[in-house]
């Protein structure tokens, strides 16, 4: 017989005991915050606590967590999850919970946090894109309203005059920029034409479009015979214009509106100019707009009287300013990570460049030689370089001349490349131990021995077993553990790799491992 609610009831009882402090056998310290809990629950939910209590169960009543990585609110949330099985972020930053879960090896929580961060980033990107689209649309609408404000103020107020003027003729003036349309319907007589006819090119659907980027910048007109088809076209604005409005003023206002639309639309403009062109050629510069628009050419007889000549220099100056801005942006982009990499490699020893080029990354860490201040991309290459400083000649070197001073040991007569290696060598004769531990007072001959000893006091276990995840303070303890518990596994893997032609076990990378393990 099974009791499905047993696990939930057990968690509830454990949570109540934790809040009451009943049977709590450990205390977790995160900075100044104290958390009472049960070892069994902590070890069951976190691999960090499992390994922490595995070795010395009776001597670890207090657990110190790194407050720089794990914050008290984040650990409190994870502790509630351990006892209740519910994860409620509330107002806590997801990044803090992710850092704490990674530190405690709670991989399920890590996956959830990464998923939430990814969704958050996607949502923010979508909202930013919508805001940009909204702003661009509002800018275009403002341009449309500004361009038509002059004509809207001259609308007829007398209905009888409007009815009387509708009988005469009707002319539509269209302006296109991207996907935004303006249609100014004239209910009065068409603009007087001084001669010639208007050349129009219709699309497959029968619609007429203007070219806002013609060589003279003027607008084309639709003929009066297109009055019947104008009602079938969707318009953004449909404004009526009195017959008293002069043709020059109408075209100038329309030209201003079209230029505002062109300035705010996302259209790429290319200017083809010759260095030897005359001043008149500036007004006839060829504009190629990379967009699928229908172009109209207005005959010279019509566009000459209404050419807004005073706007041509303004249009030319604005386009030139944009080109100068693009050139400046290109020059700013010349400083790239690739250039930084070239500058960094320039400081590296030329003899090592063939080895460095395949290793150095644009954001890689660099290592500096303390003797000659040369920079290297990895500690391995730095060690190779240091060997050139510390290399000792075989046997005893010949006695140097009085003009050259070579570091020489006064006891055994050995010569060295620098004073640093000579001082290290002299400690073997004197037994000097200049490096002393501040915790226990133990002394060591070399600094790396002191660093290895300091781990004993910090209780860190940087050496991990690849097979059982046990961690050790010293690398020698890890070697002995592998020989004792995983020797058969290592041998079987070695045989298997030789049979299948796989890389040998001695080629595998272990944390802080040594070839002495396989001797």
From Swiss-Prot:
Q: Which PROSITE patterns match?
A: BTB (PS50097), ZINC_FINGER_C2H2_1 (PS00028), ZINC_FINGER_C2H2_2 (PS50157)
Pfam families named among the record's database cross-references? BTB (PF00651), zf-C2H2 (PF00096), zf-C2H2_4 (PF13894)
* Compartments where found: Nucleus
**Biased segments, Polar residues type:** 201-227
**InterPro entries, alphabetically?**
BTB/POZ_dom (IPR000210), SKP1/BTB/POZ_sf (IPR011333), Znf_C2H2_sf (IPR036236), Znf_C2H2_type (IPR013087)
Which intervals hold the zinc fingers (C2H2-type)?
367-389, 407-429, 435-457, 463-486
Region spans: Disordered: 189-227
Gene Ontology molecular function: DNA binding; DNA-binding transcription factor activity, RNA polymerase II-specific; zinc ion binding
GO-annotated biological processes: regulation of transcription by RNA polymerase II
Task: Tell me where in this chain the BTB domain is found.
Answer: 24-91
Q: Could you confirm whether the keyword Kinase appears in this record?
A: no
Primary role: Transcriptional repressor that plays a role in various developmental processes. Specifically binds the consensus DNA sequence 5'-[AC]ACATCTG[GT][AC]-3' which contains the E box core, and acts by recruiting chromatin remodeling multiprotein complexes.
Q: Would you identify the family this protein belongs to, as annotated?
A: Belongs to the krueppel C2H2-type zinc-finger protein family. ZBTB18 subfamily.
- What's the protein called, per UniProt? Zinc finger and BTB domain-containing protein 18.3
Encoding gene (name): zbtb18.3
């Amino acid at each position: 017989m099974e009791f499905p609610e047993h696990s939930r009831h057990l968690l509830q009882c454990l949570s109540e005991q934790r809040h009451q402090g009943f049977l709590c056998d450990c205390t977790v310290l995160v900075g100044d915050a104290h958390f009472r809990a049960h070892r069994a629950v902590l070890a069951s939910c976190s691999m960090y606590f499992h390994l922490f209590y595995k070795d010395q169960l009776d001597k670890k009543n207090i657990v110190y967590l790194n407050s720089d990585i794990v914050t008290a609110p984040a650990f409190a949330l994870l502790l509630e999850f351990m006892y209740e099985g519910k994860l409620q972020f509330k107002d806590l930053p997801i990044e803090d919970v992710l850092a704490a879960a990674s530190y405690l090896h709670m991989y399920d929580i890590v996956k959830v946090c990464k998923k939430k961060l990814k969704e958050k980033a996607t949502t923010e990107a979508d909202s930013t894109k919508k805001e940009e689209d909204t702003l661009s649309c509002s800018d275009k609408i403002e341009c449309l309203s500004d361009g038509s404000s002059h004509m809207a103020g001259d609308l007829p107020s007398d209905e009888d005059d409007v009815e009387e003027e509708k009988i005469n003729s009707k002319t539509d003036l269209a302006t296109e920029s991207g996907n935004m349309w303006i249609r100014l319907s004239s209910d009065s007589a068409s603009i007087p034409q001084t001669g010639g006819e208007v050349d129009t090119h219709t699309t497959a659907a029968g619609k007429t479009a203007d070219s806002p980027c013609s060589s003279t910048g003027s607008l084309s007109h639709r003929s009066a015979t297109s009055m019947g088809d104008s009602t079938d076209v969707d318009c953004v604005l449909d404004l009526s214009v009195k017959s008293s409005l002069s043709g020059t003023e109408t075209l100038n206002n329309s030209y201003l509106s079209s230029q505002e639309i062109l300035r705010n639309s996302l259209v790429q403009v290319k200017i083809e100019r010759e260095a030897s062109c005359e001043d008149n050629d500036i007004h006839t510069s060829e504009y190629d707009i990379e967009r699928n628009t229908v172009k109209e050419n207005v005959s010279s007889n019509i566009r000459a009287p209404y050419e807004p000549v005073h706007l041509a220099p303004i249009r030319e100056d604005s386009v030139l300013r944009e080109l100068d801005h693009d050139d400046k942006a290109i020059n700013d982009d010349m400083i790239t990570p690739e250039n930084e990499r070239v500058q960094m490699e320039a400081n590296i020893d030329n003899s090592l460049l063939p080895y460095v080029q395949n290793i150095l990354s644009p954001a890689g860490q660099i290592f500096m030689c303390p003797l000659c201040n040369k920079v290297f991309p990895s500690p391995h290459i730095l060690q190779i370089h240091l060997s050139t400083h510390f290399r000792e000649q075989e046997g005893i070197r010949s006695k140097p001349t009085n003009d050259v001073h070579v570091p020489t040991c006064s006891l055994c007569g050995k010569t060295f490349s620098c004073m640093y290696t000579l001082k290290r060598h002299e400690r073997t004769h004197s037994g000097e131990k200049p490096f002393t531990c501040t915790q226990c007072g133990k002394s060591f001959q070399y600094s790396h021995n002191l660093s290895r000893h300091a781990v004993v006091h910090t209780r860190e276990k940087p050496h991990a077993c690849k097979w059982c995840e046990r961690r050790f303070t010293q690398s020698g303890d890890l070697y002995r553990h592998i020989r004792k518990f995983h020797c058969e596994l290592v041998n079987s893997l070695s045989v298997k790799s030789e049979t299948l032609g796989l890389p040998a076990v001695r080629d595998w990378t272990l944390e802080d491992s040594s070839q002495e393990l396989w001797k």
